[in-house]
C-alpha cells in the first residue's frame, strides 16, 4: 500500500507533465487547485473500477481531448455531487382554468389569471410543506418571506425587505422574472423556483384582454388600466429539461477565482392551463443535484443555461418568427417587428412555401392548401418577398373601464348596453352591476323576480284581523272628518320641474276620469340582482288628484302628535338622527328590521284592511267615491311595459310610482310592530301598545329587541319575510341605510359603507355631459352628507381634486345645467346634511372595519393614500373575492355568478319571455292590419309609437273588463304562428340581425271589452300555420347566441 506522501509527490509530477503536454502555463493558484483535487487519488487507488470509469472514454463521444483532465473533471464531480431532488406538483393545485376579476380595472381577465396563478402557486407550496419566498410580492400576496425593494408605485404598499433564502423555501416570481438581472442569484440557491410568466407562442396579438408586440427581441405589453411594459423573455419553454446555474454562495464565489465552481441543476417543467391567456405559462424548476467542477476543463454533462428568447427572423430583417408545438404539429408565427398583426401557419407548409420560385406560385399553393383569409395570404406573401416597411409607432389609448353589467342568462344579445359610466377605480372588487334597461328581457326577468314570484295571497288569522281594526282606529281617531286639498294647492306642492310640466299638460282636462294604466320600467340604478321595477301611473290626473288626499292625510294625521313618535317620513336628517338617539337611549336593547322585497310581498288584505283603510276612515263620505277608485287602482290595475308595450299582471303589491308608497309602507310597518307588541304583552291596552311602536320609515324600522320574536312571527303570518338584526355595539346600528356608530350618545352617522363603496364610482348622467363634470357633480353631494365618512369622503375628495386639476368645467357652468343635482343624495335635496362630528371619525373607522371585514389599518392606509393619489384609475380596489358572491340572476365571465345552473328556472324564464314576445308581436299585427308592423319587442325604444300606439291602447283599455275577467288580469293574445324577428329580439344596431323575408302574419285582432283577446274570425289552415311557424323565428324561437 502506497503512503499518502508518495501519492502527493507522484500527482504533482504528473500534473507538471500534463501541463507541458497541453501547453498550459499553470499559475501557482491553479496548480494548488489541481493538487488539492488530486488528493482524491488516494481514495481512487483502492477503487480500481472507479478509476477505470474516470479514464476510459466510454460509449459516447467526449468533449475533453486528453484522458487525465477528463478523469480529474469526472472525479471531482463524482465525489462532490449531491442529490437534491424534490417533488412538487402545482398542477394538483390549479384552482380554475378561467377566471376574471369581479371589478373591471381595465384588464379583468389578465388580472384574474394572475390572481389564479398566485393562488395556485401558494396552494402548491403550502400543500408540500415549503415556505413561500417571493420576489417583489404584490399587496395581496401571501408570501412569508420576500426580496422586496421599491421600483414601481405598487411596491410602496410593502416595506422594503431582503430575507435570506433557506433550505425549504420556494422562490416565487409572479410576472416579474423578465426583469431579474441575475437569475443565478435565486436558482443558484438550490431551492425550487416557481414563476407565472409571459412566454408567447405568437409574435404579436392578444393575451387575455391585453395586447403585445415585439421589437428588437423585446416584448411590449400594453395593459388597459395599467402600464405599458417592455422586456425580454427567458426561454423557460425551450427544449432541454435540465438547466445549469452557478451556485450563489460566498464559498462558490471565492472558489471561482481559483478555477473551481459549484453548479446547481434544476429540471424545468411548465404548463399553460389558462385558455383565455394562451401566452401565459406556469413554470416550476425543481432542484435535481449539485456538484463542483473545474471551470477550465469542459464537462460531458448535457445541460443548458437560460438565455433570452430571440424572435428576430435570421433570414428576413425587420420580421419576427417563432416556432411552437401545437396539438397537430409544429406551427410558425410570422409578423413584422413592432406590428400588432401576425399569422400562424403549420411549419410544414412554411417549409414548402419558402422553397417556391415566385410569389405567384406561393399564392397559388396557399389557395390550394385552403387558405382563404386575405390577411394570411397577404402577410405570407410579404414575408416571402422579404418586404420590410416602417411600422408606425403611434400613441395608444387603453380601453375604458366599463360598468359591470347585470346579464340574465336568457338575454339574447351579444354586446351589453348600459346607460352608465365609470369615472374612477371602484373601491371594492364586488362592485354593483348596471342593468341593461334597454333590453326587454331584463324587464321580463325583473317582473318575474320582483312581482310574479312574490305574490302574497295570505289572509291572517282572527287575532291579527282584530288588531288591524284597533290599529286603524288608533292612527285615525276621528272618522270622516278629513277634506282633501284643492287641486290648485296640490299642484303648487308638486313643484318638481317634471311634475309641473306634466300638470300643465293635463290642467285643462283635469276633471276627466284618469286612465287606468300602469307603465313599468327597470330603474337605471346599480344593483346586485334583477333591477328594481318602477310602476308609474301613466295619467298625471290620477297622481294630481290622489295627491290631494295623500298630502292632506300626511299633514293632518300622520304628522299629528299621536303618530309623531313612530312615523318618520317628512323629517329632516337632523330630526331623524335625534329621534334615533332618543329611541335607542330609551329602550333596553334595540334591533333592526330588514324586510325582503317589501313592496312585492304586501298582500291584498294588508292593502285593503290596513293601508288603504286609514285613508277611507279619515276622509268624509263626499270624497270617498273618488278616493275609493284611487285606492282600488293601487290593488288592481292594468299594466304594460312602458318601453316595449307588452302587457303584464302588476299583482296586488305596492306600486312604486304611487303617491302613497312611502306613507302607506310606513303605516304597514307600524301595524306589524303594533301586532308584535300586542302579542308579546296582551295585558296592555291598545293605546299603551300603540305608544310602544318603534321608528318606521317605509320598510326600515328600529324596534325593541324584546318584541323581535313576535315581530318576525307576525310578518310571516301576513306573508312577508323579515330578518331581524341584533344590535352589535362594534358595528353600530343602521336606520335608513345610515350607520350610527354610537347611537346612545351621538347623532353622527355615515352611509352604509359597503353599500356606498359598491356604487360610488358610477354615474348615470347623460353621456353628452363630460365625464369630469358628471363625476364632480356626483361627489360634491357626498362631500356634504358624508365628508367625514371612512373612505367615502377621501374618495370623493380625490375624484374632485384630480378632475378639477385636469381642466374640468368651472362651477358656474356645471351648475347651469338643469340636471346638475340629478345624482345628489336624496337627503341633500330635501332636508340638508346628516350630522357628523369630527370627534367621531375614529369611531366611524372602527365601525366600518367591523361591518366590512376589512382590516382597520388597511382602511386607514387607503384613506391616507387617497389623499395623495393623482390618478383616478390608480389601483385602489379592496379585494373581496374571498367573500360570498353577492350577485344573483346574472352571468359573469365564468358562467352563472352564484355557481348554480337550474335548467328549470332557465327554461321557465325563456318560456315567459317567448309568451310576452308573441303577445307583443301578435297585438302589433292585429293593430296594424296586414303584417306591416314591426316584430321587434324593442321597437318602442326606437320611436315606433306611431305603429304601436293603437295596439297599446287596445291591450290596456280605460274601461272596466267584462264579467268574468278581473281588471288586473292580462290574457295573452292568440297567434297562429311565431312572427319573424331579429336575432335575440333586438333590431339592427342592437346586437341582432334582421332575418330575410316578409314578417309572418297573425290572426289576432285588437282587444275589446277590457283585456280579453278577440278570437280570430278567419285564418290560415292548420297546415299553413304549422309551415309558417316552422319557417319563422320570433323571439320565442330565437336561436341567437347568448352571452
UniProtKB/Swiss-Prot annotation:
Superkingdom of the organism of origin: Viruses
Domain RdRp catalytic, first and last residues per copy: 588-713
Cofactor(s) of this protein: Mn(2+)
Subcellular compartments: Host mitochondrion outer membrane
Catalytic residues, chain numbering: 699
Record GO biological process: DNA-templated transcription; viral RNA genome replication
One MF term in the entry's GO annotations: nucleotide binding
Alphabetized PROSITE patterns for the sequence: RDRP_SSRNA_POS (PS50507)
Broad EC category: transferase
Capping: annotated span: 105-291
Segments for region (Disordered): 879-902, 918-1043
Topology in membrane: Single-pass membrane protein
Keyword Nucleotide-binding attached: yes
EC number of the protein: 2.7.7.48
Alphabetized Pfam families for the sequence: Noda_Vmethyltr (PF19222), RdRP_1 (PF00680)
Catalytic activity: RNA(n) + a ribonucleoside 5'-triphosphate = RNA(n+1) + diphosphate
Purpose: RNA-dependent RNA polymerase, which replicates the viral genome composed of 2 RNA segments, RNA1 and RNA2. Does not need an exogenous primer. Also possesses a terminal nucleotidyl transferase (TNTase) activity. The TNTase catalyzes the addition of nucleotide to the 3'-end of plus- and minus-stranded RNAs, probably to repair the 3'-end nucleotide loss. Forms the open necked connection to the cytosol of the virus-induced replication vesicles. Mediates viral RNA1 recruitment.
Note: The viral bipartite genome is composed of RNA1 and RNA2.
Similarity-based family: Belongs to the nodaviridae RNA polymerase family.
Domain notes: The N-terminus is important for both membrane association and mitochondrial localization. It may also contain a RNA methyltransferase (MTase-GTase) capping domain. The C-terminus contains the RNA-dependent RNA polymerase domain and a structurally disordered region at the very end.
Descriptive protein name: RNA-directed RNA polymerase
The organism of origin for this protein: Nodamura virus (strain Mag115) (NoV)
Amino acid at each position: 500500500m502506497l503512503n499518502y506522501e508518495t501519492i502527493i509527490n507522484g500527482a504533482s509530477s504528473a500534473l507538471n507533465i500534463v501541463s507541458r503536454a497541453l501547453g498550459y502555463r499553470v499559475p501557482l493558484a491553479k496548480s494548488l487547485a489541481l493538487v488539492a483535487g488530486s488528493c482524491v487519488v488516494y481514495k481512487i487507488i483502492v477503487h480500481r473500477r472507479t478509476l477505470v470509469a474516470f479514464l476510459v472514454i466510454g460509449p459516447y463521444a467526449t468533449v475533453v481531448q486528453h484522458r487525465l483532465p477528463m478523469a480529474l473533471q469526472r472525479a471531482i464531480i463524482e465525489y462532490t455531487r449531491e442529490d437534491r431532488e424534490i417533488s412538487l406538483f402545482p398542477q394538483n393545485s390549479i384552482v380554475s382554468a378561467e377566471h376574471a376579476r369581479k371589478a373591471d380595472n381595465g384588464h379583468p381577465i389578465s388580472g384574474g389569471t394572475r390572481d389564479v396563478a398566485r393562488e395556485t402557486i401558494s396552494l402548491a407550496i403550502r400543500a408540500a410543506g415549503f415556505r413561500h419566498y417571493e420576489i417583489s410580492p404584490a399587496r395581496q400576496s401571501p408570501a412569508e418571506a420576500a426580496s422586496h425593494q421599491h421600483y414601481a408605485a405598487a411596491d410602496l404598499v410593502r416595506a422594503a425587505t431582503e430575507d435570506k433564502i433557506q433550505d425549504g423555501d420556494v422562490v416565487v416570481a409572479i410576472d416579474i422574472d423578465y426583469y431579474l438581472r441575475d437569475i443565478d442569484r435565486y436558482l443558484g440557491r438550490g431551492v425550487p423556483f416557481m414563476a407565472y410568466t409571459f412566454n408567447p407562442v405568437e409574435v404579436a396579438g392578444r393575451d387575455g384582454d391585453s395586447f403585445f408586440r415585439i421589437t428588437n427581441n423585446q416584448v411590449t405589453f400594453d395593459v388597459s388600466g395599467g402600464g405599458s411594459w417592455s422586456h425580454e423573455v427567458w426561454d423557460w419553454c425551450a427544449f432541454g429539461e435540465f438547466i445549469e446555474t452557478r451556485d450563489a454562495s460566498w464559498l462558490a464565489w471565492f472558489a471561482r477565482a481559483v478555477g473551481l465552481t459549484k453548479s446547481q441543476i434544476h429540471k424545468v417543467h411548465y404548463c399553460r392551463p389558462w385558455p383565455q391567456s394562451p401566452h401565459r405559462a406556469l413554470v416550476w424548476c425543481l432542484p435535481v443535484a449539485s456538484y463542483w467542477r473545474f471551470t477550465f476543463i469542459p464537462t460531458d454533462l448535457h445541460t443548458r443555461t437560460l438565455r433570452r428568447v430571440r424572435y428576430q427572423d435570421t433570414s428576413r430583417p425587420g420580421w419576427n418568427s417563432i416556432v411552437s408545438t401545437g396539438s397537430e404539429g409544429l406551427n410558425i408565427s410570422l409578423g413584422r417587428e413592432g406590428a400588432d398583426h401576425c399569422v400562424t401557419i403549420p411549419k410544414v407548409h412554411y417549409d414548402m412555401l419558402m422553397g417556391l420560385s415566385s410569389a405567384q406560385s406561393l399564392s397559388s399553393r396557399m389557395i390550394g392548401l385552403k387558405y382563404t383569409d386575405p390577411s394570411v395570404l397577404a402577410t405570407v406573401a410579404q414575408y416571402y418577398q422579404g418586404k420590410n416597411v416602417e411600422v408606425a409607432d403611434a400613441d395608444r389609448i387603453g380601453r375604458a373601464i366599463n360598468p359591470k353589467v347585470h346579464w340574465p342568462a336568457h338575454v339574447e344579445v351579444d354586446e351589453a348596453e348600459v346607460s352608465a359610466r365609470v369615472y374612477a377605480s371602484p373601491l371594492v372588487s364586488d362592485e354593483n352591476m348596471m342593468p341593461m334597461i334597454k333590453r326587454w328581457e331584463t324587464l321580463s326577468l325583473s317582473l318575474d323576480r320582483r312581482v310574479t314570484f312574490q305574490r302574497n295571497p295570505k289572509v291572517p288569522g282572527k287575532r291579527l284581523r282584530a288588531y288591524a281594526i284597533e290599529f286603524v282606529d288608533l292612527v285615525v281617531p276621528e272618522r270622516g272628518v278629513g277634506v282633501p286639498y284643492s287641486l290648485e294647492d296640490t299642484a303648487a306642492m308638486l313643484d318638481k320641474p317634471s311634475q309641473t310640466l306634466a300638470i300643465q299638460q293635463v290642467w285643462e282636462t283635469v276633471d276627466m276620469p284618469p286612465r287606468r294604466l300602469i307603465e313599468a320600467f327597470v330603474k337605471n340604478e346599480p344593483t346586485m340582482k334583477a333591477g328594481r321595477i318602477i310602476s308609474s301611473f301613466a295619467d298625471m290626473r290620477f297622481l294630481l288628484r290622489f295627491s290631494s288626499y295623500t298630502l292632506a292625510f300626511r299633514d293632518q294625521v300622520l304628522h299629528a302628535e299621536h303618530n309623531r313618535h313612530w312615523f318618520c317620513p317628512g323629517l329632516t336628517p337632523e330630526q331623524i338622527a335625534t329621534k334615533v338617539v332618543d329611541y335607542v337611549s330609551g329602550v333596553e336593547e334595540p334591533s333592526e328590521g330588514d324586510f325582503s322585497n317589501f313592496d312585492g310581498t304586501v298582500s291584498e288584505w294588508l292593502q285593503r284592511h290596513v293601508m288603504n283603510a286609514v285613508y277611507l276612515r279619515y276622509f268624509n263620505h263626499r270624497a270617498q267615491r273618488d278616493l275609493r277608485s284611487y285606492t282600488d287602482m293601487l290593488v288592481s290595475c292594468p299594466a304594460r311595459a312602458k318601453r316595449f308595450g307588452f302587457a303584464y299582471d302588476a299583482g296586488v303589491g305596492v306600486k312604486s310610482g304611487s303617491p302613497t308608497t312611502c306613507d302607506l309602507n310606513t303605516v304597514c310597518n307600524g301595524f306589524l310592530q303594533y301586532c308584535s307588541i300586542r302579542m308579546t304583552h296582551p295585558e296592555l291596552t291598545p293605546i299603551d301598545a300603540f305608544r310602544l311602536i318603534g321608528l318606521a320609515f317605509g320598510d326600515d324600522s328600529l324596534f325593541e329587541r324584546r318584541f323581535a320574536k313576535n315581530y318576525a312571527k307576525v310578518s310571516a303570518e301576513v306573508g312577508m319575510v323579515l330578518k331581524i338584526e341584533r344590535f352589535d355595539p362594534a358595528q353600530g346600528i343602521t336606520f335608513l341605510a345610515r350607520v350610527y356608530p354610537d347611537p346612545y350618545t351621538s347623532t353622527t352617522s355615515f352611509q352604509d359603507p359597503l353599500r356606498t363603496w359598491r356604487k360610488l364610482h358610477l354615474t348615470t348622467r347623460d353621456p353628452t355631459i363630460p365625464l369630469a363634470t358628471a363625476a364632480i357633480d356626483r361627489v360634491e353631494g357626498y362631500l356634504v352628507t358624508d365628508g367625514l365618512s371612512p373612505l367615502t369622503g377621501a374618495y370623493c375628495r380625490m375624484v374632485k381634486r384630480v378632475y378639477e386639476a385636469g381642466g374640468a368645467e368651472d362651477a358656474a357652468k356645471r351648475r347651469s345645467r338643469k340636471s346638475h343635482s340629478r345624482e345628489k343624495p336624496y337627503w341633500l335635496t330635501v332636508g340638508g346634511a346628516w350630522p357628523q362630528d369630527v370627534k367621531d371619525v375614529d369611531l366611524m373607522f372602527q365601525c366600518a372595519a367591523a361591518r366590512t371585514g376589512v382590516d382597520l389599518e388597511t382602511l386607514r392606509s387607503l384613506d391616507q393614500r387617497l389623499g395623495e393619489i393623482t390618478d383616478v384609475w390608480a389601483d385602489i380596489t379592496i379585494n373581496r373575492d374571498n367573500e360570498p358572491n353577492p350577485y344573483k340572476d346574472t352571468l359573469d365571465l365564468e358562467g352563472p355568478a352564484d355557481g348554480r345552473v337550474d335548467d328549470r328556472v332557465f327554461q321557465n324564464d325563456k318560456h315567459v319571455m317567448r309568451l310576452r314576445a308573441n303577445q307583443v308581436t301578435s297585438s302589433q299585427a292585429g293593430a296594424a292590419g296586414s303584417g306591416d308592423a314591426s316584430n321587434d319587442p324593442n321597437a318602442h325604444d326606437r320611436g315606433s309609437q306611431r305603429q304601436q300606439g293603437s295596439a297599446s291602447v287596445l291591450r290596456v283599455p280605460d274601461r272596466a273588463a267584462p264579467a268574468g275577467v278581473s281588471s288586473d288580469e292580462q290574457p295573452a293574445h292568440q297567434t297562429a304562428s311565431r312572427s319573424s324577428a331579429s336575432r335575440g329580439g333586438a333590431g339592427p344596431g342592437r346586437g341582432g340581425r334582421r332575418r330575410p323575408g316578409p314578417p309572418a302574419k297573425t290572426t289576432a285582432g285588437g282587444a275589446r271589452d277590457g283585456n280579453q283577446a278577440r278570437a280570430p274570425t278567419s285564418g290560415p289552415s292548420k297546415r299553413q300555420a304549422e309551415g309558417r311557424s316552422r319557417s319563422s323565428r320570433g323571439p320565442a324561437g330565437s336561436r341567437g347566441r347568448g352571452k
